Amino acid sequence: DGSYRLKDSDTTETLEECLLALREISGESDASITEITAEQYGEAIREYRSLAINFAYAIPYRELCARWEIPRVQGAELVIGADTLAFSQASAQSIFIAERRENKYYRLYSQRDVDLFSVMTEQEDLSKLTACYTVGTILGGENDRLIPLSAESNLVPLRWYEESEETSQDVRRTLAEALFGENFDFVRRITDTFGNVTYMYGYGQKTFTQRVDGVLEYKNETSEGAAGGFFRDLETALSFVSAHGTWDSLDGRELRFFLRDARAVSAGKQEGYRFWFGAKMLDQTIYYESGVPIEIEVLDGQISYYRRDVISVETGGETYGFRPVQDPANVIARNYNHIYNVMTGNMLAVNEESAFEYVAQAVEDIRMGLVRIANDDRLRPAWILATESGQVFYFSLYEATPIGMGK
């Protein structure tokens, strides 16, 4: 019927089954990987029953294989990164591998008579998952991004505040001492006219700034060493945050963090990764108009940058039962002129049909969450609409009115 089912939580078991299938097929002596076109991949996923596991970031395929002891088959050298692993009835004995950011697609093919798609889906009760359709199916056009027809939520505004408001000077000084270690006695403390405090070692080789808006920022001139690779750099980042700020808010309130994005970076001869972490409260992602809760960069196995903008959220206030929200199609239909004007910078009157088609094609993602808006002490329930250009628009969940935007 052209519908899809979306699952964005409790996916660990599905991923483990996928990696097991990848290991088994790659262990066959006559298995091979070939590159296919975007059209071939799209047909296999859209025109047949299929299952796609999408990551929020690309993982180097060689490291993925090494991490999960997946043998390197003929043609594996073609695959640089992977952000999607998929199965389709179009070729039930295949595993499709994609790096969507680079528009690269591959097929790992088994010579055995095996139905990998059935193996991957036999335990899943699809009736319990959210039904979605492509943007093109609902609004017209060829956009194959998925949106739900309707939704409901019990989200309400929640008061938030910067963790520094409840974090004592002693705690922040302890954090500074941990960052500089035995060199802390040689660190200068500088306070500017706005009240921002910077600890500096040497001539700026290391700096740690505590801003009045609650943001903590650490910069470190790293020395040349050996690049760690994706997983080792990620482990370095996780360990650093655990030791310098914890994975909870500094006042002890629990937040659940997740890896939102990862990109390879370089500085001169040094190589590494920058990681962006998002946060969830009450199983809902918290979005910022600007920035993310935690951003950290690793170069040659060393922390070169760390930015922390973690908030505390009050819970236990007024609650409501689940109720209908504005459906995504209606959000787009009511706001396409606003979206078009911002995206194009054209505030003049335009052909409404052309503007609507432009926006419908530009939709990259739309989902519910809580948004931190500038100069608002409440997290607002919202639809978060991301476009292919990287612009993000926030609309009130129950009224579909614009409440903010960002990148």
Label each region the model flagged.
Residues 173-212, 216-220, 249-301, 308, ...:
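Exposed beta-strand-loop-beta-strand "reactive/processing" segments of non-cytosolic proteins
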Residues 116-117, 312-316, 402-404:
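A short local loop/turn or secondary-structure capping micro-motif enriched for an aromatic residue
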Residues 15-22, 29-30, 170-176, 223-268, ...:
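Short, non-transmembrane alpha-helical segments in secretory-pathway proteins
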Residues 391-407:
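Short, low-complexity, Pro/Ser/Thr/Gly-rich segments in the mature regions of secreted, periplasmic
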Residues 98, 108-109, 296-298, 395:
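Hydrophobic/aromatic beta-strand positions that recur at structurally equivalent sites within the blades
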Residues 270-351:
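C-terminal structural cap/anchor segments
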